[in-house]
A protein has these predicted regions:
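Active-site neighborhoods of enzymes that stabilize oxyanions during catalysis
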Residues: 39-154
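Glycine-centered flexibility sites
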Residues: 14-16, 115, 134, 160
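Sec-exported extracytoplasmic/periplasmic mature domains
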Residues: 1-4, 63, 67, 156-164
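Catalytic cores of processing enzymes, dominated by hydrolases/peptidases
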Residues: 23-24, 29, 104-107
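Metal-dependent active-site segment of extracytoplasmic phospho-/sulfohydrolases and closely related
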Residues: 1-26
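…; additionally, a secondary subgroup of soluble metalloenzymes is captured
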Residues: 141, 150-179
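Acidic, His- and aromatic-enriched active-site or binding-groove loops in soluble protein domains
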Residues: 28-44
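Short glycine-aromatic motifs
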Residues: 6, 34-37, 68
Length: 179
């Protein structure tokens, strides 16, 4: 019987939050989109502009919009591990949980999903599931929040592999799961 020797992990990549057409933030109603490049819509969007002055004006306007947090690239929280990437644009516009950033409100007839992911990963609704059972895991143990980046070093440890050095995850963060 192989079962007593198996370590089984069930996880997901993220949680989900309910969205609604009534909770949209159409940026075009607040800023001049002609001189702004918008990449993406949903829980967040990236904005850029060739004009530094236009970028500053856009930033200052967006800071005053309810249910919206706007970050200059250098101010993006370090815990997200991506502000220094070359693909990250000048501004990150992040909606509050359940709200959606859009360029234009297309009205009630346009399609909108009833839920999404991509909000701040500190929100409970964005947390992934994590279930584990097997000879290396404590029995009936309930862990504090587990960050997905820590699962790779955990699996590498279980398989007795040396994890790649250039990762953000740490086995120490999930050591409490192990016997």
């Amino acid at each position: 019987d192989i079962y007593p020797y198996l370590n089984i992990i069930v996880t997901s990549d993220h949680g989900m939050a309910e969205t609604s057409r009534k909770r949209q933030i159409p940026l075009k109603e607040h800023i001049d989109m002609k001189s702004i490049t918008m990449e993406g819509s949903g829980p967040y969007s990236f904005l850029s502009s060739k004009s530094k002055k236009n970028l500053e004006n856009t930033y200052n306007i967006l800071k005053g919009i309810p249910h919206l947090t706007v970050y200059l690239k250098n101010d993006i929280p370090d815990r997200w591990h991506f502000k220094n990437h070359y693909r990250i644009k000048d501004l990150l516009v992040l909606a509050d949980e359940g709200w959606t950033v859009v360029e234009t409100d297309h009205g009630p007839s346009s399609y909108m999903s009833k839920g999404t992911h991509g909000y701040d990963n500190a929100l409970r609704s964005m947390h992934a599931i994590f279930l584990a059972q097997g000879p290396v895991f404590k029995i009936n143990y309930f862990s504090p929040v587990i960050n997905n980046i820590d699962i790779y070093p955990l699996v590498a440890h279980i398989l007795r592999l040396e994890p790649f050095n250039g990762i953000d995850g740490k086995l120490d963060n999930v050591q409490g799961l192990l016997k």
